[in-house]
Amino acid sequence: MQVDRIILKLNSKFSNTISTWAAGSCNDLMQLSDRNLDVMSIDSLLIFNQNQVLKQDVQELRTQFDKYQKPILHIDINGTLAVGKSNLDLWIERNKCRSVLIIGADDLVDNVNLERFLNSLN
């Protein structure tokens, strides 16, 4: 991923997985608590899900980004790998994303498609 900063929510299994993956490819990796998340200081929101299901906390955060007209992308890890990867690349390029908040449910960690998708980005 060609972004300057990846922002993750603190203390979640999903964030820990993304943090491990991003450690080698991102210079600036931040983990913030919910109360320290400032939507105005983040360029965009990347949501990982499976089968288009969004948890309540993810939906609330999405609503905040919508309110400020920030770019949002959903990646369904059970979808086609090539389509998801190319959509992500185009989204980052088109929206000039520099800082991206990446969120997803903790149960995604158990889905083998998450690891497969992340490995395809390296």
Residue ranges of each PLM-predicted region?
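Acidic/glycine-enriched connector segments
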Residues: 2-99, 103-106, 110-118
